[in-house]
């Protein structure tokens, strides 16, 4: 190969030599390609002719075989975007770059998230490409205070607005003269005076629009800057023409439009300032989450307590936390006991009792006891850091509903410029033949009333505020796509253990005296069985002292037999009692049947071959589970329960909480198949679970919802995470989705409707340019303001909420 290039790809998913050989063989089948795949290093080295192939082709080939290619992600801060046409153009250019898998640009956050193949491109190339388009870009610095940066930018906008307003105010008075036939000083009507006021507004304050327009046009694009620059320049330079004609001795009074250009720019700056101010409020939820983080920690070093910055804490460090202090990082208690306020995570205001070996979460509040803890997760690995990451990703993601707006934004400005030119021609040739001014005014009005900004802000602002509000309530959406899909859910499938129930057995019923309970708990105390643990905990709550077992024997399938302090103990089922000639009174037999019918595990207790008690143990239903399921039913959502338990136990739990559909006796690997069956019936299914065996079903469902008290595997597989395990958050999550999508539709209706109605009205000459400019400025503000209403959203579902 005369002209060759070489690239190296990191491959994931190879398990043996057959994998590497298969990939190598497939790549080498391509013309002018020489590939070597190394299983040990998990890399493919490819020599190729760049005139025939590119790296993306090799990546697609590898992925088509079922393997992955390592992708890196970078977040970029972008400044200089003024409307949806800007963000749409940057996104389109980035996605066309070699090595970029996917790029999304968010106008509201002024950030881009780019997934790329490091062998083909890098973050610096991405930044350079954006800068060539005329925007400022930099790699996001997570240590930099984004809030203060935005506050400075907002202050700069305000200063420019004030200067522009001061210069434009006298010119604005001229408009009122025309409208209300008012008398003003002659100075105000002097062309030189108007020129002196309008020029700095046009070319100093408004220079940003010229720069933006030039950079966009140079790169073959067009945005709002083009509309503003063309519209205001037309008014300004026509006024210059009239002024020169007047200076050359024209006898007719000059028709000046300096006030139009200056006031237009001022109103647009005013709208941009209000928009930026409103947009800054959309990230308040994230700011509040960040403010929850502890700032320092008390570490135990050589027996001394030392305060250190939080970022200096390492895994394994021993920390002291006193009452009233925040838990600095995630960890485990090794000494002491306390109550911890975990409301920032769960929304539950009642403090949770914590003892030795219990886990504690960073940034929760220690209420009433000094504890010593070992740090287990620090920095970006803590629970709060992961929550913040999920919220950030959700707020910067795009919902599918935004696609139409993005497509339109890409063509919007050129179409509007074309319409304005057409309107000018129609007016000067047909409406007012030979008269220049009405044609100019109508075309300027068309240019300045058109607003691609509102289209670009309609979806991301609602997603940002909606996901932020949900996060404040313990509901974490992993992206805008999942916000949109959730509102379509009509069926929810709940795993039983750990989701509907608490996931740990407790004693629900006991009939017998304290001596029997003491002997029973002593017999069970050395067992690791969950039922035994429940009995021992119950005895401890009764403050009974447990002794030692002399002999112990398990009777498989029936129970246990033990000797304690010369007492012979039998604990088990009917068969165990019958085998030992112990008869059951009718009321005990009836109680046993009743407990079993309710899905409880009931055990008979005999001391010295005499029946002395009966105890029932069950995994209890979570608080509010019944209320949550009722709310889902009220919303018109079908609820089903999926469990590996037997049908009797499952039916008993379902009856308690009001679930009609029960799918029982299901093996873990069959859960995903059950979800698929429901989907084949045309249902939109959400699966709610907390365990490792729920992960395949969570992935298969249209929406996977993980309970935050569950395993990391389940949470990773889910689209929504419910913090703390409160089932009431499930209907709230669905309502948050519905409210957010409803808000997006309102915004899109306004954004489309405004342009569809505004442009024809302006074309008919019914709007003065300054009125059109004010309408354009306020259209974006109205969209952002409507989105901000979600901040006050009460997550209380309505009956059959649409």
From Swiss-Prot:
Residue numbers binding Cu(+) 1:
16, 19
Give the binding site residues for Cu(+) 2.
83, 86
Q: Which GO terms describe its cellular component?
A: plasma membrane
Give compartment(s): Cell membrane
Bilayer topology annotation: Multi-pass membrane protein
Q: Does the keyword Transmembrane helix apply?
A: yes
The record's PROSITE patterns line, in alphabetical order, gives:
ATPASE_E1_E2, HMA_1, HMA_2
Transmembrane regions listed in the UniProt entry? 161-181, 192-212, 224-244, 256-276, 411-431, 438-458, 748-767, 771-790
Which superkingdom heads the taxonomic lineage of this protein's source? Answer: Bacteria
Limits of the HMA domain: 5-70, 72-138
Q: Which GO terms describe its molecular function?
A: ATP binding; ATP hydrolysis activity; copper ion binding; P-type divalent copper transporter activity; P-type monovalent copper transporter activity
**Any Gene Ontology biological process:** copper ion homeostasis
Similarity comment: family membership: Belongs to the cation transport ATPase (P-type) (TC 3.A.3) family. Type IB subfamily.
Q: List the PANTHER family hit by this protein, alphabetically.
A: ATP7, ISOFORM B (PTHR43520), P-TYPE CU(+) TRANSPORTER (PTHR43520:SF8)
According to UniProt, the name of this protein is Copper-exporting P-type ATPase
Q: Which organism is it from?
A: Staphylococcus aureus (strain N315)
The organism's lineage?
A: Bacteria, Bacillati, Bacillota, Bacilli, Bacillales
């Amino acid at each position: 190969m005369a002209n060759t290039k070489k690239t190296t790809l990191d491959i994931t998913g190879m398990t043996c030599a057959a994998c590497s050989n298969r990939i190598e063989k497939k790549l080498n089948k391509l013309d002018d390609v020489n590939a070597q795949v190394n299983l040990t290093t998990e890399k493919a080295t490819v020599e190729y002719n760049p005139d025939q192939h590119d790296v993306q082709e090799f990546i697609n080939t590898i992925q088509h075989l079922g393997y992955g290619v390592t992708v890196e992600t970078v977040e970029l801060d972008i400044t200089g975007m003024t409307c949806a046409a800007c963000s749409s153009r940057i996104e389109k250019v980035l996605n066309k770059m070699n090595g970029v898998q996917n790029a999304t640009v968010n106008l509201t956050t002024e950030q881009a998230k780019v997934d790329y193949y490091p062998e083909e491109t890098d973050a610096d190339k991405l930044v350079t490409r954006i800068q060539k388009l005329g925007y400022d870009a930099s790699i996001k610095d997570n240590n930099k205070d984004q809030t203060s940066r935005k506050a400075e930018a907002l202050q700069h906008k305000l200063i420019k607005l004030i200067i522009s307003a001061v210069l434009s105010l006298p010119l604005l008075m001229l408009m009122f003269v025309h409208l209300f036939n008012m008398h003003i000083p002659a100075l105000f009507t002097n062309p030189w005076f108007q020129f002196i006021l309008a020029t700095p507004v046009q070319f100093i304050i408004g220079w940003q629009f010229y720069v933006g327009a030039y950079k966009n046009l140079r790169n073959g694009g067009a945005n709002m800057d083009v509309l503003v620059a063309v519209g205001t320049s037309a008014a300004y330079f026509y006024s210059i023409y009239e002024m020169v004609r007047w200076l050359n001795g024209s006898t007719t009074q000059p028709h000046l439009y300096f006030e139009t250009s200056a006031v237009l720019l001022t109103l647009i700056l005013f709208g941009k300032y209000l928009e930026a101010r409103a947009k800054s409020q959309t990230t308040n939820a994230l700011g509040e989450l960040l403010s929850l983080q502890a700032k320092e920690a008390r570490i135990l070093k050589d027996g001394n307590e030392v305060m250190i910055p939080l970022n200096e804490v390492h895994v394994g460090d021993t920390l002291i936390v006193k009452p009233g202090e925040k838990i600095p990082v995630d960890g485990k208690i090794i000494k002491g006991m306390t109550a911890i306020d975990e409301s920032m995570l769960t929304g539950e205001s009642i403090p949770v009792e914590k003892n030795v070996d219990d886990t504690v979460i960073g940034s929760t509040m220690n209420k009433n006891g000094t504890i010593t803890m070992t740090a287990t997760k620090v920095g970006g690995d803590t629970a709060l850091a992961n929550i913040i990451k999920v919220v950030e990703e959700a707020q910067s993601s795009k919902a599918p509903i935004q696609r139409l707006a993005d497509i339109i934004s890409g063509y919007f400005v050129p179409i509007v410029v074309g319409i304005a030119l057409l309107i000018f021609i129609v007016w000067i040739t047909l409406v007012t033949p030979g008269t220049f001014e009405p044609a100019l005014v109508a075309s300027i009005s068309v240019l300045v009333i058109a607003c691609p900004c509102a289209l670009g802000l309609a979806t991301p602002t609602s997603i940002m505020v909606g996901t932020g509000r949900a996060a404040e309530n313990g509901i974490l959406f992993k992206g805008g796509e999942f916000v949109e899909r959730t509102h379509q859910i009509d069926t929810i499938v709940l795993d039983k253990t750990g989701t509907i129930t608490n996931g740990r057995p407790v004693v629900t019923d006991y009939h017998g005296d304290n001596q029997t309970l003491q002997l029973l708990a002593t017999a069970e105390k050395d067992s690791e069985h969950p039922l035994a643990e429940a009995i021992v905990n119950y005895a401890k709550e009764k403050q009974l002292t447990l002794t030692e077992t002399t002999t112990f024997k398990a009777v498989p399938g029936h129970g246990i037999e033990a000797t304690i302090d010369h007492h012979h103990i039998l604990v088990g089922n009917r068969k165990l009692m019958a085998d030992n000639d112990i008869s059951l009174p009718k009321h005990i037999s009836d109680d046993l049947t009743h407990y079993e019918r309710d899905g409880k595990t009931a055990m008979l207790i005999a001391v010295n071959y005499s029946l002395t008690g009966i105890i029932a143990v069950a995994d209890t239903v979570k608080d509010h589970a019944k209320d949550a399921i009722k709310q889902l039913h009220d919303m018109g959502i079908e609820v089903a329960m999926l469990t590996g338990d037997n049908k009797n136990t499952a039916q008993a739990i379902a009856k308690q909480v009001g679930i009609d559909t029960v799918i029982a006796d299901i093996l873990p690997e069959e859960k995903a198949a059950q979800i698929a069956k429901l989907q084949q019936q045309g249902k939109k299914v959400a699966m709610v679970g907390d365990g490792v065996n729920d992960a395949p079903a969570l992935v298969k469902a249209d929406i996977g919802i993980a309970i935050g008290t569950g395993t990391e595997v389940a949470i990773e597989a889910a689209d929504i995470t419910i913090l703390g395990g409160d089932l009431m958050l499930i209907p709230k999550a669905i309502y948050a989705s519905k409210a957010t999508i409803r808000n997006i539709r309102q915004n899109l209706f306004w954004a489309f409707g405004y342009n569809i109605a505004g442009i024809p009205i302006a074309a008919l000459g019914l709007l003065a340019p300054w009125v059109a400019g004010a309408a354009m400025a306020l259209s974006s503000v109205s969209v952002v303001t409507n989105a901000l209403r979600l901040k006050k959203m009460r997550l209380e579902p309505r009956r059959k909420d649409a």
